[in-house]
């Protein structure tokens, strides 16, 4: 099992949490992006640069993810595909998606797309705050503990 990161849109502060967790636990973290990324030197952190283009990084993650792998993404359709393949999807705010919540999120995303297409300004998400970072770290730790326990 390993951690995949949809890295193009992942906040740097969340990447830092992941880097520390990789070194602390020995869990492999792979950042997938369509641009070069800077990472600290570690045998547990790697980058995978893909071609530019719509959903190229997402498709690469879906192709490589395995059952019980963790994927860090704020992309709802990517999270849905990860769950469909038996993976675990966690957004950078610490929300762990489930088969039930992902359906709700997909419906809301489609509704908001319709609103934007009709010219209504919907705004974006709030800035990532300390509470979000703590929630992410807590959910990551839960997954790491469950995964490490399952491997023993």
Curated annotation (Swiss-Prot):
InterPro entries: UPF0178. Transmembrane segments: none annotated. It comes from the Bacteria. Belongs to the UPF0178 family. This is UPF0178 protein YE1167.
